[in-house]
From Swiss-Prot:
It is an enzyme of class 2 (transferase). Residues 5-116 form the MTTase N-terminal domain. The keyword Cytoplasm applies. It is found in: Cytoplasm. GO terms for molecular function: 4 iron, 4 sulfur cluster binding; aspartic acid methylthiotransferase activity; metal ion binding; protein methylthiotransferase activity. [4Fe-4S] cluster 1 binds at residues 14, 50, 79. Residues 140-369 form the Radical SAM core domain. This is Ribosomal protein uS12 methylthiotransferase RimO.
Length: 452
């Protein structure tokens, strides 16, 4: 009997891609394939690619070319495979298979077919699959953190975004399925669940006929996981019911990742997000009133076609006015297959980059000021790693999401994968510094009257 090839994975792109990678690893391991972290030692490398913007495609292509030049057999999975399909097989002889964004559950069959010499194109033209709690999964995050996908795909048609083409229409999992997987992850010792989809506030609309995020949060409140974090909350979906569920569910963090993209109504209309233009300010104000301790992250696009200096200043003032905790800014990237590529009045590349840098410079003192407000506080920190040279523990407080926000550098003994109370002693633009709380610190907290 011929031995099965050893497989390595190269993961690129977002956390949704990461979950796809984790399912492929789990499926292959269950089928008896050896999984090697070292690409050089593996017989086949599965590259789970990103194709969201030009820079991501370039990174994916560089990775593929480097592996091809080293003589590796390659399986191209993910968004680049979904985007370009047969073109990749034609241009990369080393590519033995393509696996689409809705086809990762077929990875074992794909590998078996390649072993007989077939070049496999396993791409559904309209991705429709979404994994549930029964599909094998091997997590690649730190032991205490897991991403939990509640839905896949998107029915919106924002002018700049190619995701509906790459990921298909929205399809939500059932509440029962999501809660079952959350319980599995809790049993593995996970301390933080990060809920993800393309638009998490629209969870359930396709399955139940109305958004069901509020009900999902309340159900997840019964799961023994200390932290539940919401990513990709479309601002107009933050209904009073959702806000109440966040406020009233003990393990749901008051942390909201809001992809606002811009502030000016004219640009939002051009982005095909017109309903957002006149409510951005009201939404932020309502959130801060209902959730005064909320941590707000957002992303913006600089240099969208037609963006004038007036539009740019409007966005800059919006950032100054609302003082977000975390802001990411991307220079607009024109994408084939989106409406924005044909819009008039494109902004020159150097202007886009300058505006991006200016917006980040606007945010930095705000971020540092908000971080410095943490100095002296006792906060829970999830310890995730140890610095190899200093011995400092590295973790995150509730105000920091994994991978996209800052970290907390902690002095003192603290077990990996556990929540530890830390006194914050210093702060900079992106990170906090602290020390494990003393017994006196904890006694002082226990003596404070309840604010409930």
């Amino acid at each position: 009997m011929t031995a099965k090839p050893t497989i390595a994975f190269s993961h690129l792109g977002c956390e949704k891609n990461r979950i796809d990678t984790e399912h492929m690893i789990g499926l292959l391991a269950e089928a008896g394939y050896g999984i090697d972290a070292n690409e050089a030692l593996a017989d086949v490398v599965v590259v789970n690619t990103c194709s969201f913007i030009q820079a991501a495609r370039e990174e994916s292509v560089r990775t593929l070319v480097e592996l091809a030049e080293s003589g590796k057999k390659i399986v191209i999975a993910g968004c680049l495979a979904q985007h370009f399909q047969d073109q990749l097989l034609a241009e990369l002889p080393e590519a033995i298979a393509l696996v689409g964004t809705g086809d990762y559950h077929r990875i074992v069959d794909v590998l078996q077919r390649t072993e007989s010499g077939e070049r496999v194109n396993a791409i559904s033209q309209e991705p429709s699959f979404i994994a549930d709690e029964n599909l094998p999964r091997y997590r690649t995050t730190t032991s205490a953190v897991a991403y939990l996908r509640v839905a896949e795909g998107c029915d919106y048609r924002c002018a700049f975004c190619i995701i509906p083409h790459l990921r298909g229409k929205r399809r939500s999992r059932s509440i029962e399925s999501i809660v079952a997987e959350a319980k599995q992850l809790a049993a593995e010792g996970v301390q933080e669940l990060v809920l993800i989809s393309q638009i998490t506030t629209n969870y359930g609309l396709d399955r139940y006929g109305k958004p069901m995020l509020a009900e999902l949060l309340r159900q997840l409140g019964q799961v023994d996981v200390p932290w539940i974090r919401i990513h990709y909350a479309y601002p107009t979906g933050l209904t009073p019911e959702v806000i109440a569920a966040i406020r009233e569910t003990h393990n749901v963090l008051p942390y909201l990742d809001l992809p606002l993209q811009h502030s000016h109504p004219e640009i939002l209309k051009a982005m095909n997000r017109p309903w957002q233009g006149n409510v951005n300010d009201r939404i932020i104000e309502k959130l801060k009133e209902a959730l005064p301790d909320a941590v707000l992250r957002t992303t913006f696009i600089a240099g969208f076609p037609g963006e004038t200096e007036e539009h740019f200043r409007h966005l800059q003032q919006f950032i100054q006015r609302h003082e977000f905790d975390h802001v990411g800014v991307f220079a607009f990237s024109p994408e084939e297959g989106t409406a924005a590529i044909d819009l008039p009045n494109p902004v020159p590349d150097d202007v886009k980059e300058a505006r991006r840098d200016a917006l980040m410079a606007t945010q930095q003192p705000i971020a540092e000021r908000r971080n410095r407000a943490q100095i002296g506080r006792l906060v829970d920190v999830l310890i995730e790693q140890e610095h190899p040279s200093t011995g400092l523990k590295i973790g995150r407080s509730a105000r920091f999401a994994p991978e996209v926000d800052g970290v907390v550098y902690v002095q003192g003994d603290a077990a990996l994968g556990q929540l530890v109370t830390v006194r914050i002693t210093d702060a900079d633009i992106y990170d906090l510094h602290g020390e494990v709380a003393s017994a006196a610190d904890l006694f002082q907290v226990s003596r404070q009257p309840s604010l409930a």
